[in-house]
Amino acid sequence: DPYKLPEGYVWYVCDVNDENDRKEVYNLLTDNYVEDDDNIFRFNYSSEFLLWALTSPNYLKEWHIGVKRVDTNKLIGFISAFPTDICINKKVVKMVEVNFLCVHKSLRSKRLAPVLIKEVTRRINLENIWQAVYTAGVYLPKPISDARYYHRTINVKKLIDVGFSSLNTRLTMSRAIKLYKIDDELNLKNLRLMKKKDVDQVHKLLNNYLSKFNIYVKFTKEEIAHWLMPIQNVIYTYVNEENGEIKDLISFYSLPSKILANEKYDMIYAAYSFYNVATTTSLKNLMQDAICLAKRNNFDVFNALEVMDNKSVFADLKFGEGDGTLKYYLYNWKCASFDTSMVGIVLL
């Protein structure tokens, strides 16, 4: 049986394919999800993004778990999970990725988050899955890895205006604009948006690249199609094809942040590095192209975690170190922690 909720609250299965249910999840996250330490910015996952993030192959609707207030019928809590094969230290384990745990700000004293976690765990166990991977900004005992975010400025003036970046005596506005200028020429001239016909080759290219890491998703072709096929304002994926073969891959997703108190701007448009594979050029050149493509798509900043081989390009490409770190956790699986460069998985 489901876990008991405090008096006046009920469990609710959110149907993200239903416009109204999805809007409720969107509103809950928009007003109550992750903020930076100074409470200036808050993640603003779009409705289309949530549909993409929550409907991967083999997802179970029952794992989109909401809590509603009985009297108002308002959604005040949410958690989600989806199944996938995770390779950890060379062993493939059926796991779930858990995400979007959120409780309304006014109810944080009610201890609803632990109940949401217990309930999603119970429902996952019913499907005979006993392990999970998740990330959090907070420290819990004990992360398998702890990755810092890095930021590549694109729209200098806006990022400074909203307090995301700052100038100093040595870095004036005009110097900053010059410093972060992005060349409009791509290194890989033939980069194009990924198409359906590329799925098989991208599947092979990416899985082959990921196999060197300590933890990664063992993607199926269906998962590759779901996670990488381009969707405007959600996921951007580019491939470099040579003689009919896909040799290089760039992908980044769109996750704006709501600016909580600024007259001039209400949103920072951030591109987040997803999965990138370089075989015909250096990773530096590939990531330089990713930044250029993010600029072409009107993003203000390009963010990347120090996972996979990313860290090797940050200095050359003028990424600045962020404040936040993202901690990776495994549930019910013991293993030694490892360096972020051995992490081959990106959670949204």
Task: Give residue spans per PLM region.
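Active-site/acyl-donor-binding loops of N-acyltransferases
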Residues: 2, 130-183, 236, 242, ...
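A conserved beta-strand-loop-helix scaffold within acyl/acetyltransferase catalytic domains
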Residues: 5-105, 136-139, 188-279, 298-301
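General N-terminal targeting signals
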Residues: 28, 92, 115, 151, ...
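Conserved acetyl-CoA-binding loop-helix of GNAT-fold acetyltransferases
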Residues: 100-122, 280-292
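Classical protein tyrosine phosphatase
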Residues: 117-133
